[in-house]
């Protein structure tokens, strides 16, 4: 059997298993090798180097050095010329006929064989993307490992969609150990790589864990600050006081990971596309510009900032800037001054550092999670103090609507539903509605419109408007169900309202994934009166399940829900109702239009359902748009001071 070294780039990841793998496993190995070959031919990743020279090369920065340096490999005498070995596919010994096969074709083809079949796959045809790249996602959370909101859904699905299109993708996130999450990282192994990061008054050692899943390299940064009870960012007493320190470590580690981690036998190298998500990862573009490019490193790399929620910016006192380990001249990139009304006292100058602002200044491209939100962040109302800066970068600002995972959210296969249905056969939806009414203890009435709400119980989601509108709605012949938790005052209101309207209202305090699926499938209408919504996922889930959304026309809700117009051409009559401005009167008007259509115009209602179910909100669609952003980023020179 040929050694990994003899096989060349990527061969180390093709190790023969003890049991013959299934077709899916073989194709996964082939895809990974395809990316390896494309990286070698296209120059998007460097050929693996010995670890010792990686540290000693003068062009690399010296502020981060691996704490252990393996010995350099010894030189062995050159062997006698022999034909190139056939790469081991991991499925046993094969002896294909190589007659007439040229050296060029050997570089371009991969053999996959089993006892029954032998296939030849062309490397260039394996990738769906026109240009494949090495993509590094940096995030504070990613499903299924750790998740607190929509950010985790995006960073758990978009990397997989890009990998399936032929890109080599790494996700870098913390390795949270709080007891409940420990099992999620059980399949990640210790890479034996660790570095010391100079920041916050000392050198802090972090280690790397790795799991290869769904064609993506999931890299977990390990440090004691990620090992504590509570949620990802805080506990019952509020946000952790050292969050700035925790995510500074993450950003430094993410910059080093492509240079030192030999994943599948070779590093990602310097020509990477960094996709940094929200403030937790926003120091990455600053580090690339301030601490790497001056040393000649990452000059071919680019960065894209993805803003999921501009309300969270990572603002800390200005006195913490020296702790970040950045040169003094870079303070202006992160400088933030609070308006006078937000200062604590008359002597407060309002000076602070803002992680997200640093990324807005230094990132090569900026993406928001919907087209509407990309406009809103440039306005005084939606810009959260960064509107002028974001307006100055309009030329590199774009919006891309998030996708949904159709493996988890598909009414024809959903494991949480009692009955399945599809756009071609909607009979199962009525059965799901009856089962939901039975589960909630509501009267089983197929003729009564069932309205649902799923989300946090707070001011941003418009719960106060629902609370004021419920007495008026309960006079109508409808049923209403709410699922969520949050403000204790709203939780108490839900309980008391349920006791007052036993046959019409149900409030489920808390959150349950199975129940959320059954509410999405069983309801006729989903209400989302959010004050602002960068993207929103529940309206996408609702349309996928044939549930008609009634939403406030803001951000991603306005982008994804098309207003019903019965006089439009066939196929363009809309998918729901988007009302504006956000008032009780407008919300009630939109709901009553939906209720009237449900009762009196069954054919129009069925058209609304089917158009929503036929909409393309897959992650593959979103991934193709991100590829265009990557192309634009590489057209321009990177940020330098």
Swiss-Prot record:
<keyword id="KW-0750">Starch biosynthesis</keyword>
<feature type="transit peptide" description="Chloroplast">
    <location>
        <begin position="1"/>
        <end position="113"/>
    </location>
</feature>
<dbReference type="GO" id="GO:0004373">
    <property type="term" value="F:alpha-1,4-glucan glucosyltransferase (UDP-glucose donor) activity"/>
</dbReference>
<dbReference type="GO" id="GO:0019252">
    <property type="term" value="P:starch biosynthetic process"/>
</dbReference>
<comment type="pathway">
    <text>Glycan biosynthesis; starch biosynthesis.</text>
</comment>
<feature type="binding site">
    <location>
        <position position="147"/>
    </location>
    <ligand>
        <name>ADP-alpha-D-glucose</name>
    </ligand>
</feature>
<keyword id="KW-0035">Amyloplast</keyword>
<dbReference type="Pfam" id="PF00534">
    <property type="entry name" value="Glycos_transf_1"/>
</dbReference>
<dbReference type="GO" id="GO:0009960">
    <property type="term" value="P:endosperm development"/>
</dbReference>
<comment type="function">
    <text>Involved in starch synthesis in endosperm amyloplasts. Plays a role in the elongation of amylopectin chains. Synthesizes preferentially amylopectin chains with a degree of polymerization (DP) of 7 to 11 by elongating chains with a DP of 4 to 7. Generates distincly chains with a DP of 8 to 12 chains from short chains with a DP of 6 to 7.</text>
</comment>
<keyword id="KW-0150">Chloroplast</keyword>
<keyword id="KW-0328">Glycosyltransferase</keyword>
<dbReference type="InterPro" id="IPR001296">
    <property type="entry name" value="Glyco_trans_1"/>
</dbReference>
<feature type="region of interest" description="Disordered">
    <location>
        <begin position="62"/>
        <end position="96"/>
    </location>
</feature>
<dbReference type="InterPro" id="IPR013534">
    <property type="entry name" value="Starch_synth_cat_dom"/>
</dbReference>
<dbReference type="Pfam" id="PF08323">
    <property type="entry name" value="Glyco_transf_5"/>
</dbReference>
<keyword id="KW-0934">Plastid</keyword>
<dbReference type="InterPro" id="IPR011835">
    <property type="entry name" value="GS/SS"/>
</dbReference>
<keyword id="KW-0809">Transit peptide</keyword>
<keyword id="KW-0808">Transferase</keyword>
<dbReference type="GO" id="GO:0009507">
    <property type="term" value="C:chloroplast"/>
</dbReference>
<feature type="compositionally biased region" description="Pro residues">
    <location>
        <begin position="68"/>
        <end position="87"/>
    </location>
</feature>
<dbReference type="GO" id="GO:0009011">
    <property type="term" value="F:alpha-1,4-glucan glucosyltransferase (ADP-glucose donor) activity"/>
</dbReference>
<dbReference type="GO" id="GO:0009501">
    <property type="term" value="C:amyloplast"/>
</dbReference>
<dbReference type="GO" id="GO:0010021">
    <property type="term" value="P:amylopectin biosynthetic process"/>
</dbReference>
<comment type="similarity">
    <text>Belongs to the glycosyltransferase 1 family. Bacterial/plant glycogen synthase subfamily.</text>
</comment>
<protein>
    <recommendedName>
        <fullName>Soluble starch synthase 1, chloroplastic/amyloplastic</fullName>
        <ecNumber>2.4.1.21</ecNumber>
    </recommendedName>
</protein>
């Amino acid at each position: 059997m040929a050694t990994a070294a003899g096989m060349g780039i990527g061969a180390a990841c093709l190790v023969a298993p003890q049991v013959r793998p299934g077709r899916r496993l073989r194709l996964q190995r082939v895809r990974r090798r395809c990316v390896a070959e494309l990286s070698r031919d296209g120059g998007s990743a460097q050929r693996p180097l010995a670890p010792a020279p990686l540290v000693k090369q003068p062009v690399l920065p010296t502020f981060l050095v691996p704490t252990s340096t393996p010995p350099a490999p010894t030189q062995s005498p050159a062997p006698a010329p022999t034909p190139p070995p056939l790469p081991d596919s991991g499925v046993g010994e094969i002896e294909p006929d190589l007659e007439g096969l040229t050296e060029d074709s050997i570089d371009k083809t991969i053999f996959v064989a089993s006892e029954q079949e032998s296939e030849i796959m062309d490397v260039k045809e394996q990738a769906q993307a026109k240009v494949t790249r090495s993509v590094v996602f940096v995030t504070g959370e990613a499903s299924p490992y750790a998740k607190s909101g929509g950010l985790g859904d995006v960073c758990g699905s978009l990397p997989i969609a890009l990998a399936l299109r032929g890109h080599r993708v790494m996700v870098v996130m913390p390795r949270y150990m709080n007891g409940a999450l420990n099992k999620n990282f059980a399949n990640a192994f210790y890479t034996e790589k660790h570095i010391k990061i100079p920041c916050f008054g000392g050198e802090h050692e972090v280690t790397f864990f790795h799991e290869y899943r769904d064609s993506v390299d999931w890299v977990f940064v390990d440090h004691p600050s990620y090992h504590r009870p509570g949620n990802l960012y805080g506990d019952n007493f509020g946000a952790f006081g050292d969050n700035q320190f925790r995510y500074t470590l993450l950003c430094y580690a993410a910059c080093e990971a492509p240079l030192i981690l030999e994943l599948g036998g070779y590093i990602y190298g310097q020509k990477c596309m960094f996709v940094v998500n929200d403030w937790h990862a926003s120091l990455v573009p600053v580090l690339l510009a301030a601490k790497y490019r001056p040393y000649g490193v990452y000059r071919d790399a680019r960065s894209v900032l993805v803003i999921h929620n501009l309300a969270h910016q990572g603002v800390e006192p200005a006195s913490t800037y020296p702790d970040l380990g950045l040169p003094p001249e870079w303070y202006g990139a992160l400088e933030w001054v609070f308006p006078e009304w937000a200062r604590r006292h008359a002597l407060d100058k309002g000076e602070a550092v803002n992680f997200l602002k640093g990324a807005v200044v230094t990132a090569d491209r900026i993406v928001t999670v919907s087209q509407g939100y990309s406009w809103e962040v440039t306005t005084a109302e939606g810009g959260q103090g960064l509107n002028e800066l974001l307006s100055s970068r309009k030329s590199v600002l774009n919006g891309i609507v998030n996708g949904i995972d159709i493996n988890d959210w598909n009414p024809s296969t959903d494991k949480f539903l009692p009955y399945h249905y599809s756009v071609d056969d909607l009979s199962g939806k009525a059965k799901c509605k009856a089962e939901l009414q039975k589960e909630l203890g509501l009267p089983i009435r197929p003729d009564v419109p069932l309205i649902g709400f799923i989300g946090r119980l707070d001011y941003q989601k418009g719960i106060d408007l629902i609370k004021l509108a419920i007495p008026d709605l309960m006079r109508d012949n409808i049923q209403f169900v709410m699922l969520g938790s949050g403000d204790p005052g709203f939780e108490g209101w839900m309980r008391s309202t349920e006791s007052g309207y036993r046959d019409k209202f149900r409030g489920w305090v808390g959150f349950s994934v199975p129940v959320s699926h059954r509410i999405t499938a069983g309801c006729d209408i989903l209400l989302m009166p959010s004050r602002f919504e960068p993207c929103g996922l529940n309206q996408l889930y609702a349309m996928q399940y044939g549930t008609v959304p009634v939403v406030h026309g803001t951000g991603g809700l306005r982008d994804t829900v098309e207003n019903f117009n019965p006089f439009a051409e066939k196929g363009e009559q809309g998918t729901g109702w988007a009302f504006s401005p956000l008032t009780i009167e407008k919300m009630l008007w939109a709901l009553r239009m939906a209720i009237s259509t449900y009762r009196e115009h069954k054919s129009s209602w069925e058209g609304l359902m089917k158009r929503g179910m036929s909409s393309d909100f897959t992650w593959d669609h979103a991934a193709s748009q991100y590829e265009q952003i990557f192309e634009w980023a590489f057209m321009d020179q990177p940020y330098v001071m």
